Amino acid sequence: MEIVKRAIRLMHEGKCIYDQFQLDEDYNVPDAKEDVGNVIEGTVCVKTEDMKLVETYLKISGKAQFKILYMTASLDPQPAVLEGKLPFEEMVYVEQPGEEEYFLKNLRTEFSVSMVHSRKLSLHLLTELEIGRTQMISEEVTEDVESEHAVYKKMKKFRLLGLSDTKKDTYRIKEEITLPGTKESISQILLSEVSGRKLELRPGTDEVTVRGELQVFCLYLSEELKADWVSQVIPYEGKLLCNGLTEGMFYSVEHTLEDTLVDIRMDEDGEMRILGIEGTLLLRMNFYEEQEMELLEDIYSLQEQCIPEKQETIFEELLMQNQSRYKLTERLSLPELKDDVLQVLCSRGEIQIEHTEYREEGIQIEGILHLNFLYLRGDDARPYGSWQGMIPFQHLIECSDLPENVRCTMSHHVDQIQVSMAGSEAVEVRAILAFDAFLRREIELQTIVSVMEKPLDLEQMDKRPGIVGHIVQEKEDLWELAKQYMTTVEGIMNVNELENENVKIGDKLLIFKENMSIL
């Protein structure tokens, strides 16, 4: 007897690993730079360059690239910028390491700069890491059996979710901004911010359409050494090749915008009025498709004894692919700013998830939006300032009748953020927080892995009654009765003149042994 099997691929996600580390360094101002009068703000981008498992530890190394915006200590203070890198190496303990792939799922930083004196700064960096772990596995289901003898099969329909493809790829973004006519030409870039928003992926035939926007802010010095800025949203769209994909597939994506660059370019008139914008979108994509199939649940034969060996296997069923958006609106009273703020120039935010709870109505998320904004002041000696704080939030990703045995892959990011003045001592924060959830339900199947064949015990068969009267009990069906009394479903239906296989509790049936001469 030969078993016909079919393989289904699954992406198993292990428990995430959380780590936190700090870097404290003194930074000496280079000789080519002017003395520091006051620090406006510091920004940092932490990039991991290598991640590998060493026994029971994950060795993570990389660099923290920072920029410090400050005002010079000259008689005529001017904005200036300092740049540098802080290398790091972190050993993270891993519980029960296996043949899994480890990757950086989320990263959040807190960077502060304080003056020791005009030629030395003290840098403090706090970094929080969330490390994901995944392993692709393959499980088999039994669709059929092939035998020399006549066999009777009990089949059941299932709709299972299978991993179609997994892909790590990069999408390179190259765009340009032309300064409006009211802006002066650029001499030097002081500070630039490039963040992604409204990212949308759409699977097609052998390709993935990537669509999104870049929020760009640039603070610069003009040719007359006057500070100015430009802020603009740039849309982008492109395609990535991915053989085997079809339109309508389900997907789960982790994405990060890295290696952003803003440089000055010359326009057709020879003036420095164009900003080149570049960035690399790192994508970890898992594509899934639902597969409808009939699986073999049980088997018997009237010519031999069939003993199936079963194995418990966990598969997945799609619950929901959800792109949930939470609109946050908050008015912050900031008396410490008083009448200091003339205009908010640039704002940025990061999400920190504090607690996730699975409820019957969906997934309840509690977290914090860490907020930072750069603003323009009315003081010519100190024309810029920055503020940072946090806003708590709660959000429900709705999914009615959420089962207990649920698997969830979730990513989050700030899709949009805007800070505007709301009076002399207050600001209004408007943000859209994105939560992309891919929900699956665990299905426990008893899969037939082999069938043992034995000759029938003819002596026992002869002792069986030739005719049996049976009253249908709870959870019984015609197939189970046919197997129990060594007959066929068709035989029971013919004798009892049944039009279909549906029977209910209390029905009275007359059952004949299939090999009796009366039949």
Specify the residue positions occupied by each region the protein language model found.
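Interfacial loop/beta elements and low-complexity acidic/Ser/Thr-rich segments
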Residues: 1-463
